[in-house]
């Protein structure tokens, strides 16, 4: 079993569904001088040219997934594994340990009172073992769908299918230590983040 790193910082796991506002919340924490690591970015980093994982992917799926300039064709890979549970399982078994190790290393180097791990799949993966508290950016599904359609120019059907692949709203709420209901404007979201920032500073001072 993965062990929680012996970090000095309180680690807040930040998660939420598509178009929930988790990226905006993470950006506000960064504005408040709180370091944030994005699990999605780490997932991209581990398959950059020169990374061993990229070579393993090419050997397993074929070199057609590698573009002429040596970069992984992410869209083609997603399409390949989307409807193939076995191939998806193989890919996750390769990438998840690499992603989690990089996150652990980053968390171990944090020196601030607290830091943020932002991950859309925090509750679906073992990344939840790396955090001390879970903050869910919550949003009603109707608002979520409208935002995702406007932001990404996707159809309602596609947005609903994406939502269906993620853990449900109630599941997230049940596993949250803290919840921000993000059904208003950005000013409201930022205000709620600022309040939690003060709370987390207090927690870090008294509990760590």
Swiss-Prot record:
MF-aspect GO terms: ATP binding; dephospho-CoA kinase activity
Domain of life: Bacteria
Subcellular location: Cytoplasm
Disulfide bonds: none
Binding sites annotated in the UniProt record for ATP: 19-24
Catalytic activity as recorded in UniProt: 3'-dephospho-CoA + ATP = ADP + CoA + H(+)
GO biological process entries: coenzyme A biosynthetic process
InterPro entries: Depp_CoAkinase (IPR001977), P-loop_NTPase (IPR027417)
Functional pathway: Cofactor biosynthesis; coenzyme A biosynthesis; CoA from (R)-pantothenate: step 5/5
Signal peptide residues on this chain, from the entry's feature table: none
Keyword annotations of the record: ATP-binding, Coenzyme A biosynthesis, Cytoplasm, Kinase, Nucleotide-binding, Transferase
Homology family: Belongs to the CoaE family.
Name of the protein in question: Dephospho-CoA kinase
Species name: Hahella chejuensis (strain KCTC 2396)
């Amino acid at each position: 079993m993965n062990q929680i790193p012996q970090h000095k910082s309180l680690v807040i796991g930040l998660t939420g569904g598509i178009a929930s506002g988790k990226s905006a919340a993470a950006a506000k924490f960064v504005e408040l001088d709180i370091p944030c690591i994005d699990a999605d970015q780490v997932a991209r980093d581990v398959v950059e040219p020169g990374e061993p994982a990229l070579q393993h992917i090419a050997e397993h799926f074929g070199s057609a997934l590698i573009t002429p300039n040596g970069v992984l064709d992410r869209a083609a890979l997603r399409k390949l594994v989307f409807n193939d549970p076995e191939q998806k399982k193989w890919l996750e078994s390769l990438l998840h340990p690499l992603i989690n190790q990089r996150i652990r290393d980053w968390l171990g180097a944090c020196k601030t009172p607290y830091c943020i791990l932002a991950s859309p799949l925090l509750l679906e993966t073992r990344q939840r073992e790396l955090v001390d508290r879970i903050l869910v950016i919550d949003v009603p599904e109707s608002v979520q769908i409208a935002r995702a359609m406007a932001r990404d120019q996707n159809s309602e059907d596609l947005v609903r299918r994406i939502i269906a692949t993620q853990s449900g709203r109630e599941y997230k709420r049940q596993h949250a230590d803290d919840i921000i209901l993000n059904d208003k404007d950005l000013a409201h979201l930022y205000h709620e983040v600022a309040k939690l920032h003060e709370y987390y500073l207090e927690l870090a001072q008294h509990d760590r």
